[in-house]
């Protein structure tokens, strides 16, 4: 879900639109779960249901991951996918709430299928998308066969991705969410894992990658440091307190940060007595010091062609002709990189 309300304060003047080719030579730490959910929500059959193999296993995420990653590499981008680990304890209640929402949406999907309402199938299916552990493992397997690096985060994927960007091992974090800025990434690139065209109502709009720099956000919002940005996000709502503070919208939240300087003083004064399901200072502490690891590789390796074909074509019923052509594209794209045959860690 991410900090969507915060995005309303980030104006067009801060969002620098670029073409994929403008990111050539850059290493991008991609939020794997965010990307996979995008693929699951957008890659569907004409009846609104996801792509599936002959035994009914969902493959929309594999299709999106395979072809979109090749597109990124053809543009000269070096992708590194970062997978979520164990969430903080105070996120578990929100995760359970999301699970219930997805279950309810799936009930509506089944009802719409039974009644032949194709538009409703597509609508509710987007709300019902979920990732199983098997789907995640298949995504990791696919990336390994492609020779594309992936990292297992100890906790939040965006925290790990931001850590890699802060260390200079990746140029930016790639995600639709803004959380990586709170975790300290110097820059965020949005719209990398989505289709360049998106239908909103009857209108089809073009989506270009956009770069958002942390320093530019702080300057535009007249914030002294990242801590104040975190305070602002907590007032508006994060993954850990999605409702934020009742009655506090983007502009009011910004004024509170300007006036009181920080969350600590607000809790002693204007927010005294306000109920928080999760201690906001614990949330702030987590954004400032999340669990991360230095054990990771960003090396591109040679693809294992046979395993790729066996996995996608034999196991998951992808078109052999399309996969063979895509593998050739992948091999050509990889000539842009220094290929490693051994693991190398920072």
Swiss-Prot record:
One of its GO terms (molecular function) is magnesium ion binding. The gene is fen. Transmembrane segments: none annotated. One of its GO terms (biological process) is DNA replication, removal of RNA primer. The lineage of its organism: Archaea, Thermoproteota, Thermoprotei, Thermoproteales, Thermoproteaceae. This is Flap endonuclease 1. Binds 2 magnesium ions per subunit. They probably participate in the reaction catalyzed by the enzyme. May bind an additional third magnesium ion after substrate binding. PROSITE patterns: XPG_1. Its cofactor is Mg(2+). Interacts with PCNA. PCNA stimulates the nuclease activity without altering cleavage specificity.
């Amino acid at each position: 879900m991410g900090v969507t309300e915060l995005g309303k304060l980030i104006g067009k003047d801060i969002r620098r639109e670029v073409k994929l080719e403008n990111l050539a030579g850059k290493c991008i730490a991609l939020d794997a779960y965010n990307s996979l959910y995008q693929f699951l929500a957008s890659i569907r059959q004409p009846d609104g249901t996801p792509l599936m193999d002959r035994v009914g296993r969902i493959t929309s995420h594999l299709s999106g991951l395979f072809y979109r990653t090749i597109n990124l590499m053809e543009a000269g981008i070096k992708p590194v996918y970062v997978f979520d680990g164990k969430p903080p304890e105070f996120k578990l209640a929100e995760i359970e709430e999301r699970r219930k929402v997805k279950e309810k949406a799936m009930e509506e999907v089944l009802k719409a299928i039974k009644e032949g309402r194709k538009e409703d199938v597509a609508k509710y299916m987007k709300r019902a998308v979920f990732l199983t552990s098997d789907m995640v493992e298949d995504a990791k397997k696919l990336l390994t066969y492609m020779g594309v690096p992936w990292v297992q985060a100890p906790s939040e994927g965006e925290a790990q991705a931001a850590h890699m960007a802060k260390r200079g091992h990746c140029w930016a974090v790639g995600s639709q969410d803004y959380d990586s800025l709170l975790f300290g990434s110097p820059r965020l690139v949005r719209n990398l894992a989505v289709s360049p065209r998106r239908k909103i109502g009857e209108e089809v709009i073009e989506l270009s990658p956009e770069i958002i720099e942390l320093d530019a956000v702080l300057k535009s919002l007249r914030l002294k440091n990242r801590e104040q940005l975190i305070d602002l996000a907590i007032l508006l709502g994060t993954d850990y307190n999605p409702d934020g503070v009742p009655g506090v919208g983007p502009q009011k939240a910004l004024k509170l940060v300007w006036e009181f300087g920080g969350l600590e003083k607000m809790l002693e004064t204007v927010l005294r007595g306000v109920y928080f399901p999760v201690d906001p200072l614990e949330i702030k502490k987590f954004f400032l010091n999340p669990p991360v690891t230095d054990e990771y590789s960003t090396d591109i390796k040679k693809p294992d062609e046979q395993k790729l074909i066996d996995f996608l074509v034999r196991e998951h019923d992808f078109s052999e002709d399309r996969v063979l052509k895509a593998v050739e594209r992948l091999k050509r794209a990889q000539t842009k990189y220094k290929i490693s045959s051994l693991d190398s860690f920072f």
